[in-house]
Amino acid sequence: MARNIDPSFVDQLTPNFAQLFLDRVAKSGSLEAYRFPQGSGWESMTWQQAGDRVTQLAAGLLSLGIQPEQRVGIASSTRYEWILADLAVMCAGGATTTVYPSTNAEDTAYILSDSECQVVFAEDDDQIKKLTDMRAQLPSVAKVVTFDAASAQDDGDWVITLEALADLGEKRFRIE
């Protein structure tokens, strides 16, 4: 039995999760959004700081050519950079493909290749090694972004740091 439902409520829905995040940044800018381990203590990040970082990273992804609905991989354990990367992918209009850090190199390559990931966020040297060892099976991956700056191995710039990605976005989309 069909019901008569007024569809006008659809116009009042938030368009997507990225917009929900940006709305929260606007409403709660100075409040704590995340707390994460740093050295021997804990650091806090406000909603505004998170929003600024996500915007930089999303702009960086766009500068790398990410198009709507293109896949971006994240091979990492749970950490605040994972959250920021995922939000950046959504804000850039992409879609996230996740890979457990315990996944072996062959399965990691299959997951990322099958989903045609263009960019992959990699937590550390262990994740980067899997990707570099299987690079021939990853024809779509144009760039690997590492969360740990020490992991940015010199390989002809296939691997860049999170900071380098943010800088790419900053350079391309800077408002003067």
Locations of regions flagged by a protein language model:
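Flexible, non-catalytic linker and terminal segments flanking ANL/adenylate-forming cores
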Residues: 1-16, 37
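Conserved AMP-binding/adenylate-forming core of the ANL superfamily
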Residues: 13, 33-87, 104-109, 160-169
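AMP-dependent adenylate-forming
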Residues: 20-45, 151-154
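Structural motif
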Residues: 73, 119-121, 145
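Structured binding elements
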Residues: 93
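Conserved ATP-dependent adenylate/AMP-binding module captured primarily in the ANL superfamily
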Residues: 101-134
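ANL superfamily adenylate-forming
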Residues: 126-176
